[in-house]
Amino acid sequence: MTTNYIFVTGGVVSSLGKGIAAASLAAILEARGLKVTMMKLDPYINVDPGTMSPTQHGEVFVTEDGAETDLDLGHYERFIRTKMTKRNNFTAGRVYADVLRKERRGDYLGATIQVIPHITNAIKERVISGAEGHDIAIVEVGGTVGDIESLPFMEAIRQLAVELGRERAMFMHLTLVPYLAAAGEVKTKPTQHSVKELLSIGIQPDILVCRSDRVIPANERKKIALFCNVQEKAVISMKDVDSIYKIPQLIKAQGTDDLVCQRFGITAPEADLSEWEQVIYEEANPTGDVVIGMVGKYIELPDAYKSVNEALKHAGLKNRLSVTIKYVDSQDVESKGTEILEGLDAILVPGGFGDRGVEGKILAAQYARENKVPYLGICLGMQVALIEYARNVANMEGAHSSEFSKDTKFPVVGLITEWIDSEGNVEERTEKSDLGGTMRLGSQLCHLAKGSKARELYGNATVEERHRHRYEVNNNLLPQLEKAGLKVSGLSADKKLVEIIEIPNHPWFVAAQFHPEFTSTPRDGHPLFEGFVKAAGESVRGELEK
């Protein structure tokens, strides 16, 4: 199969939404029957984002095969059906590490290792490898044109475009077209300078996507086309919208997909966007409202919980409910008490690391349990629910996780020293293992217990969900917890690790060790989130059994 490439770059400022724009174009092309994949090239020196602070970088998105990747891959999976893998995201750090490893082995036969050709060749090889088997590969380069870190990536895609030829490669560039109230007009000069910077690298954009808070007038689009050397019809106006799921229709209406198909000589049926029209309709026509409290430690940057936020919205679509997320700092729960949780229709405690704010999360789980408020715990959110239950129901005074307390008498959560990975290999870890890439990662099989809420929600005896953790339920203390009424409703493939817990005498209390948010999409939702938001809606209407 011959693969065609669209390289996506950004200019003027960061955070323009390259990932959303690229994913939206991918969604349209997929809706035309084409097989599409996406890639994100990150210029930072970290090997992957696994050890980066969520408040700096946002969430770490985990793929099926266990890669810790940029959050943009979450956008990709929410917009297209193709599942991302470790081939779909790589960093400068990963590339340099691979090249240096080869140099140490002597693979380069004594050559002087340089950015050109060794680093650029390594980048090109990864891009070609990741695109195999698809009609179109959309490749997003992180950062902003002009950044010193991104230069090797820019040079690599420039070379690749030359090698592939115009009939197989094109460039899409996102820029900002600001509106100046004092002048009463949009300004195109930043876009002109951004394209000039791109041209200095040797890249001529074929499509310009212009971000603005309003529709860019035709005369300004004509001006941009003239000074940036692109066709007028290839200047796409992307105004701010109240939902990212409207973007596919917005750029489809301007014929962006036709430009791509014409360039590559592809004959494909018109895009069927009926699924996206349904998503937009459901989003615009809720029949009720719910307020979900998210109790976490990284709330100053909502992107730290990006997939959770989106999964809650998706569940709202499926239940025809408008979901408002109220972010609650778990440290505030510690200092101000659980009174700040009053009025919430449901409580969610997401994943996290470190002991800061953990007691606040435990208090949130206790509040939800005692007040019959729907509760969903994810990863650490399951562990704190378990700790709370052990302390206050199973009479295990001082119970804790060994992650936070080494001398607790009841370590109900402990370090996993051994488990079976997704390929059936035994993984072993100790407290001395590196932080990066050493967790239980990726998609794992889970057995669901008969008669459990989890099995009712999923409608299957087994499911596969994605993990990212190194601590688990201590099986030695599990009998005491089960005797006190805790229900284990999900077990790992070898039935040695607890994956889901429930509290039977509670209207809706479910917690999972895995991350269900990574597989939720606007078109399909996710069973756990749908059940959780449905319970929140029933709580509002007074229909939830107490």
From Swiss-Prot:
Leader sequence residues: none
Protein residues bound to CTP: S14, D147, I148, E149, K187, T188, K189, P190, T191, Q192, K223
Domain Glutamine amidotransferase type-1 stretches: 291-542
Keyword terms: ATP-binding, Glutamine amidotransferase, Ligase, Magnesium, Metal-binding, Nucleotide-binding, Pyrimidine biosynthesis
Molecular-function annotations in GO: ATP binding; CTP synthase activity; glutaminase activity; identical protein binding; metal ion binding
Pathway assignment: Pyrimidine metabolism; CTP biosynthesis via de novo pathway; CTP from UDP: step 2/2
CC annotations in GO: cytosol
Name of a matching Pfam family: GATase
Residues bound to UTP: S14, K187, T188, K189, P190, T191, Q192, K223
Active site location: C379 (nucleophile), H515, E517
Amidoligase domain: region residues: 1-266
Activation/inhibition comment: Allosterically activated by GTP, when glutamine is the substrate; GTP has no effect on the reaction when ammonia is the substrate. The allosteric effector GTP functions by stabilizing the protein conformation that binds the tetrahedral intermediate(s) formed during glutamine hydrolysis. Inhibited by the product CTP, via allosteric rather than competitive inhibition.
InterPro entries: Class_I_gatase-like, CTP_synthase, CTP_synthase_N, GATASE, GATase1_CTP_Synthase, P-loop_NTPase
Binding-site residues, Mg(2+): D72, E140
Reactions that this protein is recorded to catalyse: UTP + L-glutamine + ATP + H2O = CTP + L-glutamate + ADP + phosphate + 2 H(+); L-glutamine + H2O = L-glutamate + NH4(+); UTP + NH4(+) + ATP = CTP + ADP + phosphate + 2 H(+)
Coiled coil: none
Binding-site list for ATP: S15, L16, G17, K18, G19, I20, D72, K239, D240, V241
Similarity comment text for this entry: Belongs to the CTP synthase family.
Misc: CTPSs have evolved a hybrid strategy for distinguishing between UTP and CTP. The overlapping regions of the product feedback inhibitory and substrate sites recognize a common feature in both compounds, the triphosphate moiety. To differentiate isosteric substrate and product pyrimidine rings, an additional pocket far from the expected kinase/ligase catalytic site, specifically recognizes the cytosine and ribose portions of the product inhibitor.
HAMAP family found in the cross-reference section: PyrG
Described function: Catalyzes the ATP-dependent amination of UTP to CTP with either L-glutamine or ammonia as the source of nitrogen. Regulates intracellular CTP levels through interactions with the four ribonucleotide triphosphates.
Subunit annotation: Homotetramer.
Protein name: CTP synthase
Gene: pyrG
